[in-house]
């Protein structure tokens, strides 16, 4: 494989930096001085800090916690985001911002890293901020592509600072922006009307993208070359933005990593019943939406996040989703921008099972257990109880041992939650004329051996550390840092950073020295990403046929049989 460390060209954009200190490493009695870059934006001046990246001399300017909307506090708690207000003087953007209100214990239990580590920052309702990572080298007249990262976490947990964009910015020569959005009830609980509009978390991201359009140029970014990308719930948000009419023109490419809005894990909810259910749990029950919201506004935010068992998802029939996502897809109501998307080969390998508290049940899983645990997932897909054993038969042979039963369960959940939705989504886009690039990440990170069972392959979100250059992050306490990566894994990370940034730059992940990545066409080719990447054909062909043809036919036959039985009874 070609060494990617010298492949990516040096800086390519304009940026006028005002520094507080002119010399980066002038030693004094107090030690080396630190460069603190300052940038003038339309809203005010910000002061950041400068960081290095391993195995390269390139430096990155980092600006943390820049507000892209007014703080959603007080009467604005459940309102759509409002434009940010300008500030006087120089805003300190060198320290990590607070995370949006969330259940921190749940976040700790939902680790998306390779090393079972996570930084916990203070939580606050004043959290609509973004971080910017921009290479310091500049060439007059150029602007760098902008890559806007949307974090995952089931719309319940996560933060912008969990993903350090410095290595991707340095090696990819791009401006990386990581954004925060309101989580849980603060971002998605809705009365279904003006009193508490839904999809606020999505609207927060739209506000961030609008901020990027008007403010990213002073940081060296090109507002006409913006890529949105995200993993898990972040990938789902990317696909939602792609389908939403109100985000039109705010981005030019899209990347969804293991997350599509049409997944069964993110069904649209009935807003008013959910709002009433939650309000009753905090003594705010009311038949009046206005009174219900007023009561919730009086509650302490940290008390509201303690409540469990509330359904958090998107709603339809509003400005963000005027119709169901499936309808928007079928009617091709989306822009034909380049789209890169994919999955891992073991989506339910460990992480998601752990967060769902069903990991321990895998040790002695019988066929009956498999059916019972799968029932809620299949019910969401409207599979009749009488047909559910057919699904188990598809995944499990008679006489299978416990390891085969465990793998069948993991494969089943991975297919219905991520892989089949991703494959269906990619074909809709391909047929509409979008340039589509599909992948399956297949490498098992070497660090998994320290805390995951040997049977775990490429688990959910395991590609993140490679996309963000985990082996090259200087802050080894960072969630995605991967200091123990092998030389082969370092090379894989360099390759993936080059592919992702090349896609952001051109709309195509192919480039000199990179593994050939075919565009999705009628041959259904995709890239199998690993230490030795290669082209694959018709990912999960048999399973896709089962879910899109065989099972729907069996369900139709069952319904016809039920109707035919009712006719004699009525006579």
Swiss-Prot record:
Name this polypeptide is given: Carboxylesterase 3B
Lineage: Eukaryota, Metazoa, Chordata, Craniata, Vertebrata
UniProt function note: Involved in the detoxification of xenobiotics and in the activation of ester and amide prodrugs.
Protein location: Endoplasmic reticulum lumen
Gene: Ces3b
Any one GO CC term of the record: endoplasmic reticulum lumen
Active-site residues per Swiss-Prot or TrEMBL entry: 232, 347, 460
A Pfam family: COesterase
Record: glycosylation sites: 311
GO MF terms held by the record: carboxylesterase activity
């Amino acid at each position: 494989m070609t060494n990617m460390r010298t492949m990516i060209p040096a800086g390519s954009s304009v940026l006028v930096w005002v520094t507080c200190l002119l010399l980066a490493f002038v030693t004094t009695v107090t030690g080396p001085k630190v460069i603190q870059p300052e940038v003038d934006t339309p809203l005010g001046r910000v002061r950041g800090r400068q960081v290095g990246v391993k195995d390269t001399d390139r430096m990155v300017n980092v600006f943390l916690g820049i507000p892209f909307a007014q703080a959603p506090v007080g009467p604005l708690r459940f309102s759509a985001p409002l434009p940010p207000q300008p500030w006087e003087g120089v805003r300190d953007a060198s320290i990590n911002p607070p995370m949006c209100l969330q259940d921190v214990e749940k976040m700790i239990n939902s680790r998306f890293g390779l090393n079972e580590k996570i930084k916990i920052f203070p939580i606050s309702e004043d959290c609509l901020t973004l971080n910017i990572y921009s290479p310091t080298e500049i060439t007059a007249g150029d602007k760098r592509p902008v890559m806007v990262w949307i974090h995952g976490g089931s719309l319940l947990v996560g933060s912008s600072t969990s993903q350090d964009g410095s290595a991707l910015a340095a090696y990819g020569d791009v401006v990386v922006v990581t954004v925060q959005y309101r989580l849980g009830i603060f971002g998605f609980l809705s009365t279904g009307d003006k009193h508490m509009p839904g999809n606020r978390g999505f609207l927060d991201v739209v506000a961030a993208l609008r901020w990027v359009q008007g403010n990213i140029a002073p940081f060296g970014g090109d507002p006409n070359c913006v890529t949105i990308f995200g993993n898990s719930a972040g990938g789902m948000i990317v696909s939602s933005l792609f389908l939403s009419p109100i985000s039109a023109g705010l981005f030019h490419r899209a990347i969804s990593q293991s997350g599509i809005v049409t997944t069964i894990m993110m069904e649209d909810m009935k807003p008013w019943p959910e709002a009433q259910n939650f309000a009753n749990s905090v003594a705010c029950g009311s038949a009046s939406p206005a009174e219900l919201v007023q009561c919730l506004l009086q509650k302490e935010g940290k008390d509201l996040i303690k409540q469990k068992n509330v359904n958090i998802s998107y709603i339809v029939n509003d400005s963000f989703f005027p119709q169901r996502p499936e309808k928007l897809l079928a009617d091709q109501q989306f822009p034909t921008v380049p789209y890169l998307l994919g999955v891992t080969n073991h989506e339910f390998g460990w992480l998601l099972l752990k967060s769902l508290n069903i990991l321990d049940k895998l040790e002695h899983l019988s066929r009956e257990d498999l059916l019972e645990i799968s029932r809620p997932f299949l019910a969401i897909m409207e599979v009749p109880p009488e047909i559910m054993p057919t699904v188990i038969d598809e995944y499990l042979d008679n006489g299978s041992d416990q390891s085969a039963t465990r793998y069948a369960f993991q494969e089943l959940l991975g297919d219905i939650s991520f892989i089949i939705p991703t494959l269906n989504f990619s074909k809709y886009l391909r047929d509409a004329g979008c340039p589509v690039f599909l992948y399956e990440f297949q490498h098992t990170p070497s660090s998994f051996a320290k805390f995951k069972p040997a049977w775990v392959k490429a688990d959910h979100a395991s590609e993140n550390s490679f996309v963000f250059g985990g082996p090259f992050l200087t802050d080894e306490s960072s969630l995605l840092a991967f200091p123990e990566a092998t030389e082969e894994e370092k090379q894989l990370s360099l390759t993936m950073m080059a592919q992702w940034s090349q896609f952001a730059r051109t709309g195509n992940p192919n480039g000199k020295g990179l593994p050939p990545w075919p565009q999705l066409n009628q041959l259904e080719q995709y890239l199998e990403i690993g230490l030795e990447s290669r082209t694959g054909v018709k990912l999960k062909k048999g399973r896709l046929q089962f879910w899109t043809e065989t099972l729907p036919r069996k369900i139709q036959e069952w319904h016809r049989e039920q109707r035919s039985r009712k006719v004699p009874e009525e006579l």
